[in-house]
């Protein structure tokens, strides 16, 4: 990364690590992902949004679910932060950011799963998986390790 890029801010966002009452994790598969590639819900923060506003806007946009359907378990101290590759930085968000910085929030879904509607055209699938199966689904470089830190921090006593 050149010196000009290193002075730019990170684009902030949120990752929603959602578990259900059976301690299964909600994963989504975006269009364009390989069959083995999955992720948690989330997205970038809009100008002036708080972390919580960002979180619940993304959940509403992506799964049509409202705030009363969730209990926040915690916000991890482990952020996911990365720089865009130098050949990509100008193509993403007009070169305004050097990379992304995501807060990881763990939530329990307490609503009715039958009412979840995956509204975005970004997804080709979703599933609920147990903690023991996360590593085989979170296959992007360092993805499992990054999320595992938040899960261990906030859920270790819950998912034993």
Regions found by a protein language model. Name each.
Residues 22, 31, 132:
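Anionic group-transfer/hydrolysis microenvironments
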Residues 33-36:
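A conserved beta-turn-beta hairpin within the catalytic core of GNAT-like acetyltransferases
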Residues 136-160:
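Charged phosphate-binding loop/patch that engages nucleotide di/tri-phosphates or the phosphate backbone
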Residues 45-142:
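Unchanged
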Residues 2-25, 41-47:
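Conserved N-terminal beta-strand and adjoining loop/helix that marks the start
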